């Protein structure tokens, strides 16, 4: 039935939302549609995180699944209540926040309890079931390998890891553009990594983001320098990617010639 189809879709988005938010320790708010983040930001307060997350794509936020890793109070609830959404998830809610959020019908309001993410994933495939390890690896700053002449600052490392967490939970091929711990835009589910980047750049510009000083994260390596060329033209000068292509040197050489900093993780996140 149509109702059961909606419920199934919500469950899939809820699962994706919980997996994504588990990556972040700072106050963070995320908005998801069809298992991908269309908005996410980390800020000192939940209210500021919500506002920054919504800025990334207020159009796609319509009908989305919202999640935060901090309790929601009345002030946050009043802001969230201004848009149409299907599901909101938080560790807790104040009484007056619930009074606000329950004003509109057919909303699903969930409390996320502390529980470990299961290490295995199961997926039906042809006449059987595919069992695989869940991608739970989290890169650390000291594991990033600088491969360009230009280095990265501590602030840029924070943005690089922020973007890398998002791209890890985005459908491949995926590119994420972020700045000051705010998603500017992403290109997801593309058959070409170049198309994913072009999609992200166009989307960021359409919502008024200045990409100068933004970082780019890719969920897999660059076999050619075309992605760093497009990123450079857009104003991006800091990149994180797994590396591992036989032609890594082509992208590294372009970065060195154009003042771009690049780090490699050695870990490919390839969500299907």
What are these regions (language model features)?
Residues 31-33, 67-69, 112, 178-179:
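Short beta-strand segments
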Residues 151-170:
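Short, basic/aromatic recognition patches
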């Amino acid at each position: 039935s149509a109702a059961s189809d909606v419920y199934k879709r919500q469950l899939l988005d809820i699962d994706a939302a919980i997996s994504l938010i588990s990556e972040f320790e700072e106050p963070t708010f995320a908005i998801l549609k069809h298992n991908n983040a269309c908005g996410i930001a980390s800020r000192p307060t939940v209210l500021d995180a919500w506002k920054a997350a919504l800025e990334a794509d207020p159009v796609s936020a319509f009908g989305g699944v919202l999640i935060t890793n901090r309790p929601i109070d009345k002030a946050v609830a009043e802001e969230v209540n201004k848009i149409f959404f299907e599901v909101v998830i938080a560790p807790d809610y104040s009484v007056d926040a619930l009074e606000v959020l329950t004003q509109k019908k057919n909303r699903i309001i969930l409390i996320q309890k502390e529980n470990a993410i299961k290490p295995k994933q199961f997926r039906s495939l042809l006449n059987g079931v595919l069992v695989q390890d869940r991608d739970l690896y989290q890169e650390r700053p000291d594991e990033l390998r600088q491969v360009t002449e230009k280095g990265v600052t501590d602030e840029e490392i924070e943005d690089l890891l922020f973007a890398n967490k998002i791209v890890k939970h985005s459908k491949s091929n995926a590119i994420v553009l972020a700045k000051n711990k705010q998603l500017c835009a992403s290109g997801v589910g593309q058959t070409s990594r170049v198309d994913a980047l072009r999609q992200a750049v166009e989307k960021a510009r359409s919502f008024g983001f200045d990409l100068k000083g933004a970082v780019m994260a890719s969920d897999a390596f660059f076999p050619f320098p075309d992605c760093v060329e497009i990123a450079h033209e857009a104003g991006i000068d800091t990149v994180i990617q797994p590396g591992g292509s036989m032609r890594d040197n082509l992208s590294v050489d372009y970065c060195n010639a154009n003042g771009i900093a690049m780090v490699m993780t050695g870990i490919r996140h390839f969500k299907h």
